[in-house]
Every structure is written in C-alpha cells, then in structure tokens.
Amino acid sequence: MEIDRSRVAAQVNRADYSRSILEQIDERYDLLVLDWGLERPDARGILDAFRQNAPETQILVIAGDVPPDDPVDRGADELLTGPFSDEALHSTIERLLLQKEYEAVMDEFFRLSTERALLESELQSGLDVANEYQSVVSELYDYRERAASIRDELSADEFNQALRQLLDK
C-alpha cells in the first residue's frame, strides 16, 4: 500500500502477528503507527522495544481516548486520539516524516560542516585538497537549502520539536 502526499511518499508494512515483533523491528523504518489498545502483543512493550532497538524511528500512537498512561511520556513522538479523520492521520504522518527528514538533513549538514573545517585547515597547511573542499562546500550549500525548504514547511511548534530532537542526540 502506498501513501502519497504532496511531499512524502511512504511504503506501508503491516506487522505479522504470527512472528515475534522483535524479529520485525528494523532500524530502517521511518515511522511506526501503533494502536495503543493493542493487547497481544502489548503496545507498551512494542513502544519500548522500538525505542531501544530502532531509536530513530518516529512513533505515532493512535488511541480511542486519551489513555491514562501517556505514550508520549513513554517515548512516542505523537499521540492521535479518536475519533480522527483520514486527513488528520495523513497530515500527522506527513509532519512526523518531514521532521525526521529535517533531522537527517541537519545531521548531514553538521557532518559536512566539520569536514569543511578540516579541509580548510588542510588547505591552509598546503595540502592539495582544493577539489575535495569545493565538493564539500557545494554539498553543504545544497543541504543548507534543503534544510531551509523543509523548515519553511514546518510550523513553529513542529520546527521546535524537530530542533529538540536534534539537540537530544
């Protein structure tokens, strides 16, 4: 099943309850949508396992009502309580994936900034790294533009949440 929104496309995989959830946890998942009412396997255990084994995965918890035990306090990125529309679900998923993309872009931006600083130092000491330096500067510019583009799509609250997650790393 494909969800194709204006900016975000995602492939959806469903859990196979005939196998252990632990076997299905994959760090490559961008997003987990978790029904907080799930009893077998236990939703709380699934959330804990994903946080331990795939910490980069965004976790959206859905629940019929506000649960007494807050999934966000337990490590979920977002709680969506019912009843909610398809549009609310889609926009929440899109926002979480944009936040994840922003974090990835900023991680690469910071990595390239460090690399640029090292190459500048090597250039000043006479090493022939001009081509590498120009390549990194060009990539850095592209990532800065990409980050600005994503930032423009996030509300102030969404941007602050993405920034907090970056600083928590």
Feature locations, PLM:
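Receiver (REC) domain switch/output surface
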Residues: 88-101
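C-terminal output/effector regions of signal-responsive regulators
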Residues: 105-169
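A short, hydrophobic beta-strand element within the central beta-sheet of small alpha/beta folds
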Residues: 50, 55-67
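Short hydrophobic/Thr-rich beta-strand motif most characteristic of the beta2 strand and flanking loop
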Residues: 6-17
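Receiver (REC) domain switch/active-site region of two-component response regulators
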Residues: 85
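Alpha4 helix (beta4-alpha4-beta5 surface) of REC/receiver domains from two-component response regulators
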Residues: 64-78
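Conserved phosphotransfer microenvironments
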Residues: 18, 23, 27-52
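A Lys-centered signature of the CheY-like receiver
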Residues: 82
